Amino acid sequence: MATGSIDTGTDQLLCEVRERVAVITLNRPESRNALGDIITPALRRMIRERGEDPDVGALLITGAGTAFCAGGDVKGMANAGPAVEMTPDQKVARLKERQRTLTGALVAVRKPTVAALPGPAAGAGLAIALACDIRIVSSSAFISTGYARVGLSGDYGIVWLLTRLVGTAKARELLFTADRVDSATCERLDLVNRVVPNKTFRD
């Protein structure tokens, strides 16, 4: 039976089963829980394994510290060694597989999924939150698509996820401007289900 702490293979990702809820915590607070080459594969595996675990009834994803997830670790990408040479088709195929096994897997999980945002969610981090069934955020949280600020197009299904929730016109606005959207506005746009005061968010 899956109870207590679950070994994720890295201290960058924590997982604990509490009363049949798998609480998965992105644990890189020093980088606002940005996704990188260690945490991301571990997150994929936890989503898959806990999604298939008969002793788990729901998944909750949250972030350590004051952020949910800042998206991809852009600084880490810049400091990485030489990339493996790939054709454009190979790069597209790799990205599709990464998306399918992360946000795609979240959408497909046949159990309730909840994103609990203690603070900002941006880029791929926002996509992870949007892929969950329910989003609960602290009052100081905000979201941003972020991609336009670093000259990238949206990935991890964020275009589809946003369009499904807010419609084509608003989704395009959020993607093109990469504006910060505060928690109250997110609730008004139905991007989140509930806003919780900061002081009681972790209760």
Name the predicted role of every residue range.
Residues 24, 61, 73, 128-129, ...:
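Hydrophobic/aromatic residues within transmembrane alpha-helices
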Residues 7, 48, 63-105, 121, ...:
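Glycine- (often His-adjacent) and acidic-residue-rich active-site loop
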Residues 1-64:
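Conserved CoA-thioester-binding segment of acyl-CoA-metabolizing enzymes
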Residues 27, 72, 118:
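Histidine-centered beta-alpha loop that forms part of the nucleotide-sugar donor binding/catalytic region
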Residues 37, 104-203:
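Crotonase-fold acyl-CoA enzyme core
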Residues 36, 40, 92-96, 175:
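Amphipathic, non-transmembrane alpha-helical scaffold segments
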